Amino acid sequence: MAGNSIGQHFRVTTFGESHGIALGCIVDGCPPGLEITEADLQTDLDRRRPGTSRYTTQRREPDEVKILSGVFEGQTTGTSIGLMIENTDQRSKDYSDIKDKFRPGHADYTYHQKYGVRDYRGGGRSSARETAMRVAAGAIAKKYLKDEFGVEIRAYLSQMGDVSIDKVDWNEIENNAFFCPDADKVEAFDQLIRDLKKEGDSIGAKIQVVATNVPVGLGEPVFDRLDADIAHALMSINAVKGVEIGDGFDVVNQKGSDHRDTLSPEGFGSNHAGGILGGISTGQEIVANIALKPTSSITVPGETITKEGEPTQLITKGRHDPCVGIRAVPIAEAMLAIVVMDHLLRHRGQNHGVKTETPKI
């Protein structure tokens, strides 16, 4: 079956293409009684929206979301929530040159080989434009988690190219176009993007996403471990090539005596595991990092082939992000929120009455 849905109890299904009439999604499983408006969803959509700064694509889409169903008089009804965003700034002529060519590093070749037909306009379904609906659905999950359980999910850009942050100030993230928590690194990020634009090239990035106040006990071993589902969700984001939970690949250099998160009546002594043990949340912060590749939509000529298999060169035209990691910050938040929301509802349904003699730390 086509992989257009994620989640079990809180299930999100998206549809639409980059240059199609509209994007949409269906959200199933949201409990009734959640106060929600289009404005609540728009806040996160505006953070992801293209054309909002000189550092991202200049495609200007208002990304105004419409709630089609599942909400009555400002409250969720418990039925399917239908959401839609109309596409308004398509420039399909920019892609006429790739109608019969495959952009190297993109999904053009694989989509063509799999389906036998390809919407070449902006990448069609493979475009990151699809993630607008993930952000809209994730905003519902974020609001429910915060209102009902005090769970907060936030993310930031921690590295772009060879420029890494040195500190994290959560209050600084919304003060700059990079979602950067280190004010001292904003200028370096700015200069890096300027240089890339002159070169017609792009760069990769790293994002950290954190969930706080997550209850202990979320996760369904063995195949639906919480960290497994988080990795699945984050890896489904366009351009993501790596996911780390907690210390991630740094554990290779750690000893067991250093890595283990010791316990005491006052709590855990560390959080190397990223808030998940045995696939189940510990009650600590859930911490994940994702690595995003540099986009291949650049003006530097590259070798490729035509649909007939003939060698050719290609320069990608159109409006593209020099670093896709910038606008991926709210997308990462949305995907983590969807997973945590799904597992919270699953846990509540099966384990609501479970009590132990051990106090929660």
Swiss-Prot record:
Pathway: Metabolic intermediate biosynthesis; chorismate biosynthesis; chorismate from D-erythrose 4-phosphate and phosphoenolpyruvate: step 7/7. NADP(+) binds at residues 48, 54. Its cofactor is FMNH2. It is an enzyme of class 4 (lyase). FMN binds at residues 125-127, 238-239, 278, 293-297, 319. The keyword Acetylation does not apply. It catalyses: 5-O-(1-carboxyvinyl)-3-phosphoshikimate = chorismate + phosphate. The keyword Flavoprotein applies. GO terms for biological process: amino acid biosynthetic process; aromatic amino acid family biosynthetic process; chorismate biosynthetic process. It comes from the Bacteria. Keywords: Amino-acid biosynthesis, Aromatic amino acid biosynthesis, FAD, Flavoprotein, FMN, Lyase, NADP. One of its GO terms (molecular function) is chorismate synthase activity. Its EC number is 4.2.3.5. Reduced FMN (FMNH(2)). GO terms for cellular component: cytosol. Coiled coil: none annotated. Pfam families: Chorismate_synt (PF01264). HAMAP family: Chorismate_synth. Homotetramer. Belongs to the chorismate synthase family. This reaction introduces a second double bond into the aromatic ring system. This is Chorismate synthase.
